[in-house]
Amino acid sequence: DRLSESWLSLYRSGSCPSLVLAHSARGLMDKFNQSIWSTESSGSEELDDKQPLSQGCAAWFADSNKKALLAEVGVGTLDQAMMAVMPFKHNNLRLLGLSDKILLADEIHAYDAYMSRILESLIEHQARSGNSTILLSATLSQQQRDRLVAAFARGAGSRAEAPLLRYDDYPWLTQVIGQEVVSQHVATRKEV
């Protein structure tokens, strides 16, 4: 629901980007179901001249998690993106779907060692492809941060390293920009 309030603001006014929810509960989201075209709405499998073709594309993207990343905006579990760098059937389709996209992942501190390594591979691929990655965590350790920064730097062809942080630097923001890693303290609100 939070995304439904804000995702269109990322696009030009009047545009109609495709949105796909790539998780199992997508059928429970009324706004999402209303945003995609289905043959039940017209009662026919024939194209209706009154329905924009973009709705047909959105429905095609939404009918399979394998195609979900091809939509302009996709929301789902990170494993859908991770399968792009794993030896799965149709991983090349997922890689294509990630091209020219910003990967946004939350709660990245929660992954075990195995999943963290796959995430590092995904981040490295994103950087190698010239794509941006935004990783969010409230409790990411220095070691985890260093490995993720190193993965992005490798993909970008950089040898940049994350500077050490002191305990009182938390919370922090880290950016890999070209050959440089910038880390800075982030001010917090007094009340939440």
Q: Which role does the model predict for each range below?
A:
Residues 1-192:
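N-terminal helicase ATP-binding lobe
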